[in-house]
Amino acid sequence: NNLAFDYQPDIFHFNFCGHSGSFIIDNDGNPTVINGDFVEIDLSNLVNDEQTQNEKENYPHPKSSAKIIITTLDGYQYIFGGNLSAIEYSGGIRAATKIKDGGGMCTSRFVAANAWYLTQIIAPDKRTVNFSYKNTGYTDYNDNIWRFTEHYVGPPTALPKHSLYKNITPTSFTGYTLSKECILESITIDSPYNLRIDFRSSVAQHKLYSVSRCGMCKPNYQLDAVVVTKNNRPFRQANLRYAYQYREEDNDNSYYWRFLSRVTLSDIGSYQLEYGHGSME
């Protein structure tokens, strides 16, 4: 009697290069624009197959070939996704100790894609702009899901294929959610411009959340430099440096704040930034 089905369609929002709007997928699997610019949307490569149990237990992820193609009235084609580095996704897990020792996630839930990032622009004359993203794996962690799992009373006898309740035990348990974000790595513009913009990033010196949770968390990243090359020759570069401030709180909930401390431009010089927030590291 507690089984319920959600028939409300998911709303997909898009916003790129001056075009914005929303669309839904109807019961026949076709996209329908519900507001915003008129565009043609191709979902033929948007794969949503259920994962195998092995995929669920070993750092699961969406199908890597999933992509959305949007064509605007001026004939430009915009491609989103198409590889895992350009898909933002998240999933729930159990048995948190498995994260610490690098083992599988032991999850009984499928992972959901939250966003598809722009990977390519194709002009009517076939000129292209390509966007690539860093292969980061999971970059965020949240331990509040237990508040929801307390309400699970056991799986019903009949389950829809993609049910979130599949194989969950009748008793409550502590669970975790992990999120994989997309971090832009480079933009390449072909002839006649022959430009490449590299966004160089590294693992931050300190993690920017509760110190007591750091053992469970993946590293976060910081932007170190933006490098522009033209015809394979250096053209312009900006380097960034950061400072950290330790914030001590009660209940072992201390954390760091990060501040931009210096910007160096190859064609201008350096800028120093100072803050009135106490000592920095």
Language model features: what each stretch is:
Residues 149-177:
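Surface-exposed acidic, glycine/proline-enriched linker/cap segments
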Residues 70, 80, 121, 187, ...:
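Beta-strand-dense domains in secreted/periplasmic systems and polymorphic toxin scaffolds
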Residues 79-84, 107-112, 129-139, 171-178, ...:
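Aromatic-rich beta-strand edge motifs centered on tyrosine
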